[in-house]
Amino acid sequence: WNLLKRYTKRKDLVVDPMCGSGTTIDVARDLERRALGYDLAPSRKDIFRADARKIPLEDEKADFVFVDPPYSDHIRYSGKPECIGELSAEGDAYYLAMEQVISEINRILRPGRYMALYVSDSWEKGKPFMPIGFYLLQMLSQHFGIVDIIAVIRHNGKLMRNHWHTAAVEHNYYLRGFNYLFIMYKPAAGERVPQDRREADEIAEEIEARAVHKDG
């Protein structure tokens, strides 16, 4: 919600190439944005079947792209062998696939527009720590300018359980209670600073809402 309010306007085209359950397109439509969702295994009729490495959209058509890619091999995704979620984040194949996804995002995104990627690092007992976020940020930086890096706290009740903390001490690791949100910008020709794309009335509405909340 905050991303679309800050970086898009009404009737902008929002694209999610790894759409999952469709949250992105639902939020976009609620905010009067147009939306396209793609997924290798669509969960709804309004999500189109497509591989994020080959998005069926013309060049420079999207006004905003959000992507929440798979980022470890301890979660079962579609079960399809071609699914990026079936690739181990320990291997080169995963990062090659994500390079293709990021290149496609760059292709479909209009100049002077924003995109965001939501991801976490990964650690499993008996396996090396995988700084997936850092690797993907490096890839993103080949195409886009960095606008902001947000640490999004995961409100996961499991992390509060005592046995998780005991295990962390025993095996000498930290509990990872956050994801990265990388906000990136594709500059138009001659641009050096990202443009503020917010609409004046939406800014005013948000300021008023916060003032009412504070006073209340």
Where in the sequence are the language-model features?
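Class I S-adenosyl-L-methionine-dependent methyltransferase catalytic core
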Residues: 1-216
